[in-house]
Regions:
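Intrinsically disordered, low-complexity polar/acidic regions
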Residues: 30, 34, 38, 63-236
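Conserved small/polar residues in nucleotide/adenosyl-binding loops
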Residues: 241-243
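Juxtamembrane extracytoplasmic/periplasmic/luminal helical "stalk" adjacent to the first N-terminal
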Residues: 6-67
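Positive-inside N-terminal membrane-insertion signal
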Residues: 1-5
Length: 243
């Protein structure tokens, strides 16, 4: 009887020891997952900001030309070469598209009023009213495929250069990118290769629902979560190592 009691105590001690080891291992894996999620969230922010720099370069040219870009198509061509995921670049004075590159496959966009389109107006209005670049999408393209866009509002003073004049809304610079191609430099596929399950989501601006943009094949269980702060939008990157 005494021997049985000793055996039970030893078994219980072994179980508690193993349980403790497993608990520590899970905590370590979770901490590692938190580091990985933070790293990739930062990468996504950087890659998106780098892609969106095209819009700011167009803005600089627009200001230099006091609201006009005489060589728009030449400059736009070079910007597309810099960011191969770019689908098109638009100039929209007062929200109405007047120039688009590449022209031939996007010429139907000429005359399109971004403020009048119920499916696209929300982000355009938010960009104008906030005075900040705003992400639209990702959304389905009419010609097929999936894309996201940046709407950059431009405000300018009087052409005479009166520094006391209040800047007025000129319009929007819109750059559209193929999605998820725009995120290729992030190398999300490395997460799968290194035994991580991940999911990238966004909050729908109208419904508040969480919409999954990209994910691993496996389902996440007790994931680590991190917001990805983007222009006038937040995405959510969540992930977890296999444990």
């Amino acid at each position: 009887m005494y021997a049985l009691g000793v055996l039970l105590v030893c078994l219980l001690g072994s179980y508690l020891f193993l349980f403790r080891l497993e608990h520590v291992r899970v905590l370590q894996e979770r901490e590692k997952a938190r580091y990985v999620v933070d790293s990739y969230a930062t990468k996504i922010q950087y890659v998106v900001a780098n892609a969106f720099s095209s819009a700011y370069l167009v803005e600089a040219l627009l200001r230099q030309g006091e609201g006009r870009i005489s060589e728009f198509y030449s400059y736009a061509e070079e910007l597309v070469k810099m960011h191969p995921s770019t689908i098109n670049i638009n100039l929209a004075p007062r929200g109405v598209v007047t120039k688009v590159y590449p022209f031939e496959r996007n010429k139907k966009a000429i005359g399109h009023d971004l403020f009048a389109n119920p499916e696209r107006s929300r982000e355009a209005l938010l960009a104008r009213d906030s005075g900040k670049a705003t992400i639209a999408g990702p959304f389905d393209l009419i010609q097929g495929g999936y894309a996201m866009a940046v709407r950059l509002p431009v405000f300018m003073g009087e052409p005479e250069g009166d520094i006391t004049a209040q800047e007025k809304f000129w319009g929007l610079i819109c750059v559209t990118f193929a999605f998820p191609d725009v995120l290729d430099p992030v190398k999300l596929e490395y997460l799968d290769k290194h035994n991580y399950v991940y999911q990238l989501s966004r909050i729908h601006p109208d419904t508040g629902d969480r919409i999954v943009l990209l994910r691993s094949a496996e389902t996440l269980v007790e994931p680590v979560e991190r917001k990805v702060h983007l222009p006038n939008a937040d995405w959510i990157q969540i992930g977890r190592a296999h444990v």
